[in-house]
Amino acid sequence: MIQNIVIIGTQWGDEGKGKIIDFLTPQVQYVVRYQGGHNAGHTIVVNHKKVTLHLIPSGILHDNIINIIAGGVVLSPVILVKEIQKLKKINVLVDDRIFISESCSLILPYHIAIDLAREKISTTVITNNNVIIGTTGCGIGPAYEDKVARRALRVYDLYNLKNFENKLKNIADFYNFQLVQYYHAEPIDYHVVMDEIITVSDILIKKVIDVPELLLNARKRGDKIIFEGAQGSLLDIDHGTYPYVTSSHTTSGGAIVGIGVGPKYIDYVLGIMKAYSTRVGNGPFPTELSGDIAEWLCTRGQEFGSTTGRRRRTGWFDAVSVRHAIKISSINSACLTKIDILDGLKYVKICVAYQSFNGEIIYNFPYSLENLKNITPVYEVLPGWSGRTTGIKKFNQLPLEAKQYIKRIEEVIGIPIDIISTGPDRLMNIIVRNPLNF
């Protein structure tokens, strides 16, 4: 029986994970975020109303589901409290349904300030390649830097606010020197930061729980758990398009580390992928489009970041990069989203391989940035469809060409597609196989 399922993105994020998690949540008892921070926006449509969350797990919109923010997440205290307040205003039950790990590292204003300062200058200290990453400006990277450098403030530091203030002052001095001397930016007043912390600290402390112990006991009881990934596999710090990546592990392995459970407690991995490709920010994008079709995908797909509002770059479905995501996360099956956005196109393309500058055909995703810059997609062209897929709930009701497109994607990525999303609403899905019913 499947008890624990990891749900991750197979592209560069924005694949529609939130909607699918929201759809599957009624079948589980827990939803757990394990990496990233509030740079991960997930938008869910319920009864034609959009709800956008950045930090709180998607399961919060269902009564009786316990939502956990595990230790691998970098947590903004202010953002968490704001999201809790926003949910309460729309009558979502929050109390006793959101818990956090005391080992979460905190995102504080100096992380955001240094993040924005780095992005403003023409070159960045994040890499040695004289490039701008195109971050969300949420302070995620600097917060993870503090974590690795062993100077981060964590949730458990809130237990003693006097000690917290002393540590805060030292770290603020560290960052203010950089902000003023190197980036010529305004310093952060640690007194203001401390005032914010005093305001929210009690709320956070009351939500602390021993996450590994809680989930171990849940498994013993036979409860089902969704481990909710943020961003996408191609943004993984080790296996993504480095240096144009996020600062955490976005693969299924990140769940093990970020939560504090062993590999044997991962029963299934579901990969979410769009029927086309998108990317926000800078970095390699082999199948990127320009012109009318790019505009079509962006406009019809509403491809604007839920965190930054930035326009997403769009391109054809890239089977090479998705196969890479499947390989590095041991993905069992896939969910294909936004098939409805392709309705009306005369043709659709699938990138099945790359061709190098010297004519070599490449079937595996390169790690080297230089190799990625010098490849050309090898496409298969399939007929488009004029019929509508929006809202269809049975596979055999899809237009013939849409079915052919989906089947061909299954063939070239090498795993089955269990779920097909046919629209933004949580119930607009074709369920070929329910991964939680195995």
UniProtKB/Swiss-Prot annotation:
Disulfide bonds: none annotated. Its cofactor is Mg(2+). SMART domains: Adenylsucc_synt (SM00788). Pathway: Purine metabolism; AMP biosynthesis via de novo pathway; AMP from IMP: step 1/2. It comes from Blochmanniella floridana. It is an enzyme of class 6 (ligase). GO terms for molecular function: adenylosuccinate synthase activity; GTP binding; magnesium ion binding. GTP binds at residues 13-19, 41-43, 312, 338-340, 421-423. Its main location: cytoplasm. Binds 1 Mg(2+) ion per subunit. It catalyses: IMP + L-aspartate + GTP = N(6)-(1,2-dicarboxyethyl)-AMP + GDP + phosphate + 2 H(+). This is Adenylosuccinate synthetase. IMP binds at D14, E15, G16, K17, N39, A40, G41, H42, T136, R150, Q231, T246, R310. It is found in: Cytoplasm. Belongs to the adenylosuccinate synthetase family. Plays an important role in the de novo pathway of purine nucleotide biosynthesis. Catalyzes the first committed step in the biosynthesis of AMP from IMP.
